[in-house]
Amino acid sequence: MDTLTAIGRWLAKQHVVTWCVHHEGELWCANAFYLFDAQNVALYLLTDDKTRHAQMSGACASVAGTVNGQPKTVARIRGVQFKGEIRRLEGQESDAARKAYLRRFPVARGLPAPVWEIRLDEIKFTDNTLGFGKKLHWLRDSRAQQA
């Protein structure tokens, strides 16, 4: 199994992302439920335009963040660190992402918040189930690396 497939399978089983945005010397982090899109290597989430992180992001911004599980033992620790770009989706792109998101999280049907995409450009996946401290790396430009 290649690196991106392994990372993608794990990301598809999780549901909460933390991301941080930087704007005019200020940092802010946020959490949200997400849907992983393996084809585009992206996370889709809903967040209101009035939130601090959305206002700091504007139409598009660089972000860094994490996705991690909550295992009971160190030997089962798995988690992702990433950097990428967040942008607010519009039109058909937004409609398609919202439809997929609502299939995964039907409770969000009444939420009018816009859909945002975090395009993952670099991923470091720590997977202790493969050996303590085992890391898999993926870069959008090179498509896959392993360390």
Curated annotation (Swiss-Prot):
Family per similarity comment: Belongs to the UPF0306 family.
Alphabetized NCBIfam families for the sequence: PRK03467.1
Name the UniProt record assigns to this protein: UPF0306 protein YhbP
Species of the source: Salmonella paratyphi A (strain AKU_12601)
